[in-house]
Amino acid sequence: MVSLMRLDNYIVLGEEVDRLQLKVEGIIETIFKDCDYYINQLRKSNAFKLLYRSSKDSSNFYKLKTSNLETGRRPKDMGQVMHNLLNDKIFNPVFGWNVRDGVFASSKILPFYGEPYIFFPAGKFEYVWSPTVIDLYDDMFDKSKLDFLYYYAPEKEKVAYSIQDLTEEQIETLIKNLQNMYQSDDFKMAVRSEHEISFKCDKYYIVNRFMTDDFEKYMLDLIYHPESESKYNPFK
């Protein structure tokens, strides 16, 4: 009787694994279909990294989310005045879109803004990043990193107002220095850098990185070694 009960448990467990496998494979099929442009860019880059985005939304599997490009993103830390100034005066004139309203992701896992999920932009996208600026909000308030931003009040929110007191020449210097720090190419280095990358996309997926055991390893192999017979499979 005991052995039969144990056998029943194994059968139930096996059925649960089969159901999970079908669900995960269905999710991966959907993401690879909707995000094929992004996945092809990752493969071409050979960066062998994933990008992550933190979210306070909770999901055991994945969520499809809409970006704030049309409505404008409400900044979590940076003041709205500074946020708008960066878009209007620095990023839009160079890249043609409000970079600070983009969807931010990084190859570095950052749990400060919620649970880190694997990030997949859907459809075509544009991106902007900096080889020197890891996180613009952090760097804007760190004198040692942006020495040209030398005039601001001690309280971080006052930065937006103290900048208004700069001369036109000083503002132009600030704008040019920031513009020169950003670029919209070299996707391989952008992914490898662990710096923030702003994506211009309409929709994107956040995928639970603990969906299965070693799920990140599974995704890395599926993306970067699609033809390999020895690629990792969490269900075997």
Regions found by a protein language model. Give the residues of each.
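Classical Sec-dependent N-terminal signal peptides that target proteins to the secretory pathway
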Residues: 1-3
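ADP-ribose/NAD+-binding catalytic cleft of ART/PARP-like enzymes
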Residues: 8-98, 208, 220-222, 230, ...
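Intrinsically disordered, low-complexity boundary segments flanking structured domains
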Residues: 33-43, 106-110, 183-186
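Sequence-level motif detector for i,i+2 pairs with an aromatic at +2
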Residues: 46-49, 114, 194, 202
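Short, flexible beta-strand-to-coil junctions
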Residues: 53-60, 107-110, 120-125, 193-194, ...
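ADP-ribosyltransferase catalytic core
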Residues: 83, 87-159
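Active-site-proximal loop/hinge segments that shape catalytic or ion-binding/gating pockets
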Residues: 136-236
